[in-house]
Amino acid sequence: PIKSSAASDVYKRQACMNQSAGGRGSFILRSTTGKPEGPYENIEGNEDKAIFPNIDGSLFEDTDGTVYFVGHNHYIARMKPDMSGLAEEIKTLKESKYSPEPYVEGAFIFKYDGKYHLVQAIWAHRTVKGDTYVEKEGLTNKKTRYSYDCIIATADNVYGPYGKRYNAITGGGHNNLFQDKDGNWWATMFFNPRGAQAAEYKVTCRPGLIPMLYENGKFKPNHNYQAK
């Protein structure tokens, strides 16, 4: 039996994305009551095995009601209308990748201002030649990891191609972005305990919310936000 999970999310369609910390893949559970507190049941799409064989599964609902499964870093598939499983084979998103492409995780998609926004988490390395997301043998390693960043790219189609990535949050990677009832933007984060930046803090590995701003087509932290 699966005794723990990570990177879990709850969606308004009463589906819970549950990734096993035991490395068994990503699963979708459905609320039997239609309420977020459950109880939850397994869906047909992962009765025999995980619906996705890797970590960091999430769901995205488009403006036309179509729901997509988004997995790990670069993967997507349309869900069946009844949310019982995948309606198509898992596809690879079309992206403007780094060269060479580093390890990426925490993929999440949302739509705003007529664009699809692909959110991912990548390690920034601080090296003798400057800061970089590109991992190079002899230059970057676990000791050069500095910050676990939130990067975002946009596209006109949910499958891509997604444009050039930009840094949205330094040190606050692995996110969901959402608007509250007042229209304020927020990003979730968990403060990865690894990396030189995290070593500067006494407490890490904790959930948090970051107030965000959307300006000139990009998201960034709202340093002037004041709670009511």
Place the predicted regions along the sequence by residue.
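Conserved beta-propeller blade signature
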Residues: 12-14, 66-70, 117-119, 185-188
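Blade-edge beta-strand/turn elements of extracellular beta-propeller
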Residues: 30-52, 80-102, 138, 151-170, ...
